């Protein structure tokens, strides 16, 4: 199966519903613009969902787990075994995103794409196994062409399931020791940034560890300097879970499902997705600005204004999940407030 589907046309938001939602906002019992960005969020959701009364009750959260060969370079404060252990923790409901998904009433899908410490078959975990780990990007490409194709397809499979459940919002998350290094390398390659500007603390590195991480990224960029296309850069510098996120974001935009992007790693995937298929950008909201050093540069590259800034750097889709009540509030206000005529209140 080819990956040419990633270049297919994206859905187009409904301009008529956008206009209807804007008109309703102008009639609600408040000064124009008094609810700030909440008004714009409601209008965007109305256009995406093709209704003048949008909602964010049916949420699909997919967390993609995969290990990285670059972890062998000592770029994380945690051992590689943690990835597989966290997959088990997701399945048991003990991880942060599992708690948040329960609180939100959201559907949580965990996808095991390949971890060194494989927990095997687990309830509530989809096994889309590619390999125990990507390759070390300091020595060779992270993925073969076949592995990249399979990872992209794994993300698209999530969207097919989400669409069948009439999902109103998709949120992607990730788990993988070493994946901030891969995301930073991708960011450097796509934005012509210096590694020192993109390498951050990740799981908790000190200044010396961050400097070492930047050196590792420099080596990887030098090895893969001839990679010119976004897809080839993803293949050489990314990872299974990052590629799955790229596939999910593209498939969601093609299916007309809005996406709430999480933190640093998911934003790197979103940047790749928009470089591969520019129509994806119209379907993206950004949940928060993380504490990870390179996140601000990625957000600027997509002219993205995140909803929250809480100094988070956990990943797992946790920051995006925390922002979902904000979207629900925007919809509740839009749908539930009275108009001036309904309330018998004088308009300006």
Swiss-Prot record:
Any one GO BP annotation for this protein: cobalamin biosynthetic process
Keywords associated with the record: Cobalamin biosynthesis, Glycosyltransferase, Transferase
Enzyme Commission identifier(s): 2.4.2.21
Substrates-to-products reaction catalysed: 5,6-dimethylbenzimidazole + nicotinate beta-D-ribonucleotide = alpha-ribazole 5'-phosphate + nicotinate + H(+)
Listed InterPro entries: Nict_dMeBzImd_PRibTrfase (IPR003200), Nict_dMeBzImd_PRibTrfase_bact (IPR017846), Nict_dMeBzImd_PRibTrfase_N (IPR023195), Nict_dMeBzImd_PRibTrfase_sf (IPR036087)
Any one Pfam family match given in the protein's UniProt record, by short name: DBI_PRT
Active-site residues annotated for this sequence: 316
Pathway annotation: Nucleoside biosynthesis; alpha-ribazole biosynthesis; alpha-ribazole from 5,6-dimethylbenzimidazole: step 1/2
Domain of life: Bacteria
Any one Gene Ontology molecular-function term assigned to this protein's record: nicotinate-nucleotide-dimethylbenzimidazole phosphoribosyltransferase activity
Job of this protein: Catalyzes the synthesis of alpha-ribazole-5'-phosphate from nicotinate mononucleotide (NAMN) and 5,6-dimethylbenzimidazole (DMB).
Recorded family membership: Belongs to the CobT family.
Protein name: Nicotinate-nucleotide--dimethylbenzimidazole phosphoribosyltransferase
């Amino acid at each position: 199966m080819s990956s040419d589907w990633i270049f297919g046309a994206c859905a187009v938001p409904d301009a008529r519903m956008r206009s209807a939602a804007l008109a309703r906002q102008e009639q609600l019992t408040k000064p124009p613009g008094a609810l700030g960005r909440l008004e714009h969020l409601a209008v965007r959701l109305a256009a995406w969902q093709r209704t003048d009364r949008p909602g964010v009750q049916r949420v699909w959260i997919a967390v993609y787990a995969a290990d990285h060969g670059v972890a062998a370079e000592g770029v994380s404060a945690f051992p590689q075994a943690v990835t597989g252990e966290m997959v088990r923790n997701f399945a048991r409901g003990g991880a942060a995103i599992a708690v948040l998904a329960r609180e939100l009433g959201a559907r949580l899908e965990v996808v095991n794409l390949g971890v060194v410490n494989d927990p095997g078959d687990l309830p509530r975990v989809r096994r889309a196994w590619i390999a125990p780990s990507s390759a070390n990007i300091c020595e060779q490409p992270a993925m073969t062409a076949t592995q990249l194709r399979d990872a992209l397809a794994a993300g698209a499979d999530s969207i097919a399931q989400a669409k069948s459940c009439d999902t109103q919002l998709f949120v992607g998350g990730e788990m993988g020791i070493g994946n901030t290094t891969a995301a930073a390398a991708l960011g450097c390659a796509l934005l012509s940034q210096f590694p020192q500007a993109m390498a951050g603390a990740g799981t908790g590195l000190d200044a010396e560890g961050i400097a070492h991480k930047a050196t590792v990224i420099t080596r990887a960029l030098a090895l893969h300097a001839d990679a010119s296309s976004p897809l080839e850069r993803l293949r050489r510098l990314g990872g299974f879970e990052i590629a799955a996120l790229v596939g999910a974001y593209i498939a969601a935009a093609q299916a007309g499902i809005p996406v709430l992007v999480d933190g640093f790693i998911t934003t790197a995937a979103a940047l790749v997705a928009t470089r591969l298929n520019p129509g994806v950008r119209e379907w993206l909201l950004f949940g928060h600005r993380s504490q990870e050093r390179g996140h601000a540069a990625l957000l600027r590259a997509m002219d993205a204004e995140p909803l929250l800034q809480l100094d988070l750097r956990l990943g797992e889709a946790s920051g995006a999940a925390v922002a979902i009540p904000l979207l629900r509030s925007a919809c509740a206000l839009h749908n539930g407030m009275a108009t001036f005529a309904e309330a018998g209140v004088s308009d300006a």
